[in-house]
Amino acid sequence: MKSRQGISSCWHNKLQGALFLSAFLTWGLGDAVTSLWMIEHRGITGEANLIAQYMITNYGASSFIAMKIWFTTIVLFFIPFLIQKRSEQPVYWMINGYYLSFFVAGVLAMILNMQAALNEALLLQPEQVIFLFLSLIFILTSVGEEVDKRTNPRIGNYFDCFLSDIAKVLTFITNRN
């Protein structure tokens, strides 16, 4: 895919994909797995999230992980997708700020879960992490929105970039033999 300068680039797509994957792995999977590990060591009352407590107590750990993956997919994929589809203006950097907020929250949640499981002093209280997370969403999406207004980024089609990457991998594989 060629841009206006004649340079083939999908780095915007790769950056956003990496941020999405990082947020999914930390806020979605990492938090769920470390929560279960912490509950194994401290008991169900160690979990600060009442919804997670209810899910694990009544439906088991596998249902909790399935629910967390489902909810994470909706929050990280469908909400930004709807924002991009409905927006007249570019929202690339705004969505990157959104993903970065979830990544930071996921890392902090994992750290707190591991500290609680090991009976260590907590870096932050869960309420502080939630406040920080909500603040980051507000700040980073606002900054991203302003950057989008000033730079007007031209983002390539995700599917075209994906096909281009597949073609590069296949070319590399066939040229090796």
Pin down the residues of each PLM region.
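Hydrophobic alpha-helical segments at protein termini of multi-pass membrane proteins
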Residues: 2-177
